[in-house]
């Protein structure tokens, strides 16, 4: 998911460079959403991993 966020970030930069501001804003918004979803999934997995690790040891 981080890969897609980076791809949309690059699309946003290229579109902004060529003056397509609406496309740039849309791609940047998608990149932000994907980044925060990936961050939330990482934190959930981290919490479960620590919790289950405590149960095992």
UniProtKB/Swiss-Prot annotation:
Which GO cellular component does the record give, naming just one? plasma membrane
Q: Key word Transmembrane helix present in the record?
A: yes
Location in or out of the cell: Cell membrane
Enumerate the UniProt keywords alphabetically: Cell membrane, Membrane, Transmembrane, Transmembrane helix
Highest taxon of the lineage: Bacteria
| Family designation | Belongs to the UPF0391 family.
* Name of this protein: UPF0391 membrane protein azo1765
């Amino acid at each position: 998911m981080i890969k897609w966020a980076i791809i949309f970030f690059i699309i946003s930069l290229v579109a902004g460079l060529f003056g397509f501001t609406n496309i740039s804003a849309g791609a940047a918004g998608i990149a932000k959403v994907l980044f925060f979803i990936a961050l939330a999934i990482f934190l959930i997995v981290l919490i479960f991993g620590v919790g289950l690790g405590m149960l095992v040891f």
